[in-house]
A protein has these predicted regions:
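An edge-strand/N-cap motif at the start of beta-rich repeat modules
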Residues: 1-32
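Structural preference for solvent-exposed beta-strand-turn elements
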Residues: 8-9, 14, 105-215, 309
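Short glycine/acidic-enriched loop and turn motifs that connect beta-strands
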Residues: 14-18, 66-71, 121-126, 211-213, ...
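Short loop/turn segments immediately following beta-strands, especially the blade-tip
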Residues: 27-34, 81-88, 141, 151-162, ...
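Beta-propeller fold detector
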Residues: 36-43, 90-97, 161-178, 224-229, ...
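Blade-loop segments of beta-propeller domains
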Residues: 37-112
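Beta-rich, blade/repeat-based domains predominating
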Residues: 46-56, 99-110, 130, 136-143, ...
Length: 396
């Protein structure tokens, strides 16, 4: 591997029209040669929507982002894969079911040998039941998927051992609401979209876009809720990152198309909302739903991808920790916010950003201007239905 290269894993979704089966693919990216060399692949999981690299044990965790439609159908799982490839194939070491549909996020606690998953659950009605009788009257009952946060115990080698805790979230938002997701019924129940370990590993923070809450748990084999912050109705907290010191949180609000800035007390878990700004250009007036958010290693720049405006926007962070939007790069047009580009990573040295542009079936590789945070696309390569990008190794 050259000094200007990096190895990444790309999780993909299955795609009926192209017969693409989904799976995970690893590539060596050479920034000087502007090339991508396929190293290994696996067709399972078919819905590899989130990946986490365990550098200590050189293994990769992946979700299978699906929901079972019956007791005899495949349910969602978390799996671990060895990076000691055999015949250019990932090797599955272990898998375990998630107690919750559509796992969308993983967080690794190496010190405690724990893994956390946020399980979003499906959107819309799962089942419509008829209850009652002739005497009492007939009624219609609607049953929705549960959303959960699951804790998995790991072996010292990183293998999945067992589930140690399941937190089933409760509540709902305004139904129907002004969001066009599921015709205004996207908040019929909770929807955990991320579970992020705080700097130092004391807390796990869960963004619940179904109830407009950010929940703080004390980390451990059994999660203990210690705090929560309710956001304004129909804002939809989604993903978050911490500042370098851990004193500030930057959080995407999916329904209101904003980035929120919060003060975080890493000793007590207390939260304070101090700022909200739009993620899109002032001239853009259509529907937009931001997804991923990343912070540059210099702590000077934030990056957010927009689904609707179809852009990756960069923000400058001032001395008070507040972001201001400075520019954007236009991406392929999304089919709809649920079928759009939504994942990217910044290389450890802060020089490059690698983006999964799902509607275009492309991985876009950018250089980052360390003076103003702006992006310059340097090359692209084809990957069918890319959903997530994770860095496996590279220069810092």
């Amino acid at each position: 591997m050259s000094t200007e290269s990096i190895v990444i894993a790309i999780g993909t979704y299955s795609q009926e029209e192209s017969l693409h089966q989904g799976g995970i693919f690893s590539y060596e990216i050479d920034f000087d040669l502007k090339s991508a060399n396929l190293l290994a692949e696996t067709k399972i999981p078919s819905e590899a929507g989130y990946l986490v690299f365990n550098s200590k044990n050189r293994i990769l965790y992946a979700v299978d982002e699906r929901r079972a439609i019956g007791p005899n159908t495949n349910s969602s799982e978390v799996s671990v894969y060895s990076l000691k490839y055999e015949n250019n194939k990932f090797v599955n070491q272990s898998s375990i079911k998630t107690f919750g549909a559509n796992p969308t996020f993983l967080a690794l606690d190496v010190d405690r040998n724990l893994l956390f998953s946020a399980n979003h659950g499906g959107l819309g009605v799962h089942a419509q039941k008829i209850t009652g009788n002739f005497e009492s009257g007939w009624k219609t009952e609607f049953i929705f998927d549960d959303s959960s946060v699951v804790t998995y115990k790991l072996s010292p080698e990183g293998d999945l051992i067992e589930v140690s805790d399941v937190k089933v979230l409760t509540g709902n938002g305004i139904v129907p609401n002004k969001s066009p997701q599921v015709a205004g019924f996207a908040q019929t129940g909770p929807h955990a979209h991320c579970a992020v370990l705080s700097p130092g590993g004391k807390f796990v923070l869960v963004a619940d876009k179904g109830t407009d809450q950010l929940i703080v748990y004390e980390a451990g084999e059994i999660l203990k809720e210690i705090n929560s912050l309710k956001f304004p109705d129909v804002t939809g907290p989604r993903h978050l990152v911490f500042s370098e010191t851990g004193e500030l949180i930057y959080l995407t609000l999916e329904f209101s198309s904003e980035v929120a800035t919060l003060i975080f007390d890493n000793k007590t878990g207390n939260l304070q909302l101090i700022n909200r700004i739009s993620t899109v250009s002032p001239t853009f007036k259509e529907l937009n739903e931001p997804a991923e958010i990343r912070i540059h290693r210099t702590n000077k720049f934030l990056y957010v991808n927009n689904r609707g405006e179809d852009s990756i926007a960069w923000f400058h962070i001032d001395e008070d920790g507040l972001p201001t939007r400075k520019g954007d790069f236009k991406l392929a047009k999304s089919i709809h916010p649920g079928l759009a580009a939504r994942s990217f990573v910044i290389t450890p040295d802060g020089k490059h950003l690698i983006f999964a542009d799902r509607p275009a079936n492309l991985i876009r590789v950018f250089s980052i201007d360390i003076n103003d945070g702006s992006l310059l696309e340097i090359f692209v390569f084809n990957v069918l239905n890319p959903a997530y990008v994770e860095i496996l190794e590279g220069k810092e």
